[in-house]
């Protein structure tokens, strides 16, 4: 599989407004930030992107734990983690690493929605204070329905030093620009 150089891929700054009627007209006319209008045909297998980095703080880790009711001693009890835990310090909940890691490369593609996730693995522990980043790679395209195809992408979350901590594959259902052309295999 060849990887397309990032420089040849035009980034999306925003999609044209849908002109919502419940805000000032001059605001409603602006392009939408962090939104894409890509269709199935626009996704290229092998295309890769890397996110910015982010450091996971104790506060946000504990907020997430409280929100999802995850109070396992490894993520919520400093004394247990230091004295009895196998890592000697508190972990960040895997569900938070998953959420934050995918969020780092998330965009709002108006022609796509999530079909599901496969192969989710927590490969190495992530600790409070660790800095992470994510690499997304488009793995496959599969025509599926009359108006929609499936895009499979891998998400690899790394610590700042390059150690992988999480892997998963996300399947998205994406609208065809021209269903007749895709269904005939002529993309």
Locate predicted features.
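Hot-dog-fold acyl-thioester-processing enzymes
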Residues: 2-115, 177-187
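A structural signal for short, well-ordered beta-strand segments
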Residues: 52-54, 136, 155, 168-172
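A short acidic/small-residue loop/turn micro-motif
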Residues: 56-57, 140-141, 172-174
């Amino acid at each position: 599989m060849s990887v397309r150089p990032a420089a040849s891929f035009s980034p999306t700054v925003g999609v044209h407004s849908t002109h919502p009627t419940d805000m000032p007209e001059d605001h409603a006319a602006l392009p939408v930030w962090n939104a894409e209008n890509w269709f199935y045909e626009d996704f290229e297998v092998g295309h890769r992107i890397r996110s910015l980095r982010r450091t996971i703080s104790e506060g946000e880790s504990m907020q997430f734990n409280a929100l999802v009711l995850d109070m396992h001693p490894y993520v919520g009890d400093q004394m247990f983690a230091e004295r009895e835990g196998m890592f000697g310090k508190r972990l960040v909940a895997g569900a938070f690493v998953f959420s934050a890691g995918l969020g780092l490369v998330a965009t709002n593609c108006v022609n796509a929605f999530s079909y599901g996730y496969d192969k989710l693995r927590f490969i190495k522990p992530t600790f409070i204070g660790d800095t992470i980043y994510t690499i997304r790679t488009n793995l496959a395209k599969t025509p599926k329905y009359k108006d929609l195809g499936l895009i499979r992408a891998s998400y690899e979350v790394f610590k700042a030093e390059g150690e992988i901590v999480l892997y998963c594959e996300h399947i998205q259902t994406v609208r065809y620009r021209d269903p007749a052309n895709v269904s005939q295999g002529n993309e």
